[in-house]
Amino acid sequence: MPLTFYVDRRAWRAHHQRVLADRPALVPVVKGNGYGFTLPLLAEAARQLGPAGVDQIAVGTAQEAARVLGFFPHDLVLLEPFLPGAEWVDLPDRVVRNAASVDAVRMLAGRRLVIDCRSSLRRQGVARTELRELRSALRGGEAEGYCVHLPMERPARADPVREVSDWVFALREAGLAVPVMYVSHLSRPELEALGLRFPRTRFRLRTGTDLWLGDRSAIEARATVLDVRPVARGERIGYRQGRARRGGWIVVVSGGTVHGVGLEAPKIMRGVLPRAKELGRSGLRAMNRTLSPFSWQGRRHWFAEPPHMSVSMIHLPGTQAPPRPGGELVADLRHTATHFDRVAIFNEDLATPASLPRQGAAGARPAACVSSSSSS
């Protein structure tokens, strides 16, 4: 029984239309694990947004582009820069390569390409001091556009509009045409300010998280309950044979480390309260107490022990009625790091109303549910 990602297609599409109305010329980002949806599903969703003006998608790597070519008929712009000397992946001409160094531009000259500009993110890109050399590397040709990838969080005095503007001025002063500038993490007023300042340049916002995951009411992750067993206080359980702290129930659910359950990326802590909470969580983990992402009856519960490869063991107190095998627990997971067994789409047909099954209903599934394996 699977770890399932439910998608209300009707609500999801309505959110897409709202985002597109607010951010014209948007370029959807389709990369990584597909934000939990899978890459083909996102590419197909972007294709359906064509009438709203979506004529490009931004794809993480050349390998990812090869996977989604059959699902999106227009241009694919790579986010990963070409590395001279790396293995070359043959792709059709509608895939636009990315260059982040003068050497890469020199090797890609004559091909369709966009060029990364080094921003305050300090991650990759050509520097302003290299622009004359860059012009020579283009050998009389032109890039289809330039990219300025901006930080999500900025110091109080940071001005992203000025940062992008400085790059447009610098490129033009070097004799380079800037027909398109790809940007990220800018608001609509900031985009409008750039458009007024540079009417001959088209500013295109690359967006992934806000577009695909921005309406949490349209999506929900759920883990299938595989088994429920009573446990007495002090009874040994699990691979590591730790003792149960209290009597109650051990609930075995789908979803383990292979799915991304229990895996956590480092976080930036700002302020006293977030740091204090993190210290508290660290103290609990040192005592082998870790809160799981799984909820039952509106409450998250503790891992009985660290998640296994494909399942997790959760402890429920004996005072609470447990779920039944075949039911589901809501899972609060990081979508960009989770690989679901199944993506279940409902409200696919607008003439067929549907809703999520009640939590814990054994075997219940939404009507008009279309399943997609995460391996597709």
Question: What is the predicted role of each segment?
Answer:
Residues F5-D8, P28, R162-S376:
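Active-site anion/phosphate-binding pocket segments in diverse small-molecule metabolic enzymes
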Residues L3-A14, P24-A177:
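Active-site-proximal beta-alpha core segment in soluble small-molecule metabolic enzymes
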